[in-house]
Amino acid sequence: MCVEKQKADFGVYEKQALENQTGLYLTRPEAYAEPVLCACVMDAEGKEKDRIFPLPLENEISFCMRVEQPKLWNAEDPYCYQLILEILEGENFSHDRRTESLAFCDWKIVGGLTCINGKAVNFRATALPEGKKASEVQQFLRIMKQTYKNTLLINSDKRSSQLERWCREYGIYLLEEGKDADAGWLRARLDMDRENEKNPDFQLQVVQTGVLIENHSTFVNASEYNLHYEILDSSGKKCSENELCTDVPAGTSKFVDIPFQCPAEPGEYRYQVSLCLKRDVIWAPKGYVIASSETKISNLYERLENENQ
């Protein structure tokens, strides 16, 4: 896949301060006599995937960059690359440096269904309210992700490069009225008012010996999250907790045995199991709960059995 015809009009890019990373391409002692444009593509792990040789700076520059076998983007796992652009002159002096997120995604309509990377997806949509400032739009997208919405519906005049960037980074499908009618705009619009109190992608059923994990997501393995379990007393005080990682591919279910010990004190306890983020993401911190369930357990019966033996 190629990134083609990127303009040197830096107005479309968001400026980011990246310390001690200037001068990507000055590989000889001679300085650049005239301003040049340098560019590279980095993956999410910070590994360089491609670069161009310095190009003389012009009002408009076309170039092609290639990423071999790119990791594909979807709303459940919004993997983004970074296009880094820099203007250099003199002895590695940087006039300007900008970055733009890139995503590779195969979006097709197959039999009336929207397929992303070869899999049919369900849109859980909400509409972008009128008159929101940039900071308010980001907060709106954050709440969307936390309430299990994956699709933003917009009017044509609301589309912008900044909104597209945010949707890529947050993991949100963007549908435009009229233009994306075949892609599912109407179906998403009709389904817009449905509220999801629980995450429709993951369902947990907890019993005393473990948890049944039903993975209804399209792309993501449950191993992308930590399985956190804890025991709390009747006052809500935490008696014990631990975490483990479990393998439950998308579209499957699995019962997971969870090793734990009942508290020594007799009584009823809450046994709570959650799937939590393994790392910070743009819309929530590490440890944020994306799905949870609980049951009550008691050690009274077990203690009576032991006393009668």
Feature roles, as predicted:
Residues 1-176, 180-309:
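Secreted/periplasmic carbohydrate-active enzymes, especially glycoside hydrolases
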